[in-house]
Amino acid sequence: MEKKLISLFSGAGGMDIGFHAAGFSTAVAVEQDPSCCNTLRLNMPDTPVIEGDITSITTQVILEAAKVNPLEIDLVIGGPPCQSFSLAGKRMGMDDPRGMLVLEFLRVVREALPKCFVMENVKGMINWSKGKALEAIMTEASQPIKYAGKEYKYAVSYHVLNAADFGVPQFRERVFIVGNRLGKTFQFPEPTHGPSNQARQIDLFGKQLKPYKTVQDAISTLPPATPPSAMALRVSQTIKDRIKNHGY
């Protein structure tokens, strides 16, 4: 039986794609950006997309769109906006309204009561204000929840994973916070790739890491491409302007 998930802060659906490959289907997606919502509707035509600010969207509305009741959904996933914790930004953390959106994610988790949840964010979240943000999130996520005469509690753990360690040609570290109410201990995956000097070594379990993939490994077989318009030549400055407008 296909497992169902609720997707929060869905963006263009990248995180959903990963979970679809793992056998899940998205029962409902919640996203504020209109362009991202159009992309979600194009790529997931059978999935309800709720377009709007999550702070004004009740969990009941989300559950109704997903056609489930509390306790019936398998998974809640999401990557709340990370600018307030990013090492590239001003790092206002929980003092920034965007930083507080991690609590909106947990609000939906606590009211929808999925079997499990996965939240992704930038590595900077761990160290913000000497770990106070992470401590607050872990504490909130671990609080007992009473529903229909019963009490539920999530076992929560976190770990920093680097995309390069799993065959992606990019060094991209992210913290993953995982919780489940099934009484199970979650095991984070072990790296499959590493630096060339480590890739030649065999660990204690007889496992040999593959060498990191490079951009050349990923795209060298693609045919040469020419930008279809002058727009590509202006992207760099456009990105700089967008970064400036987002508080960096």
UniProtKB/Swiss-Prot annotation:
EC numbers for this chain: 2.1.1.37
One Pfam family here: DNA_methylase
Keywords: DNA-binding, Methyltransferase, Restriction system, S-adenosyl-L-methionine, Transferase
GO BP annotations, alphabetical order: DNA restriction-modification system; methylation; negative regulation of gene expression via chromosomal CpG island methylation
GO molecular function (one): DNA binding
Active site: 82
InterPro entries: C5-Methyltransferase (IPR050390), C5_DNA_meth_AS (IPR018117), C5_MeTfrase (IPR001525), SAM-dependent_MTases_sf (IPR029063)
Residue span, SAM-dependent MTase C5-type domain: 3-248
Top-rank EC class of the record's enzyme: transferase
Catalytic activity of the protein: a 2'-deoxycytidine in DNA + S-adenosyl-L-methionine = a 5-methyl-2'-deoxycytidine in DNA + S-adenosyl-L-homocysteine + H(+)
Domain notes per entry: Corresponds to the N-terminal half of the enzymatic domain.
Family membership noted in the UniProt record: Belongs to the class I-like SAM-binding methyltransferase superfamily. C5-methyltransferase family.
The protein's assembly and partners: Heterodimer of an alpha and a beta subunit.
Protein name: Type II methyltransferase M.AquIA
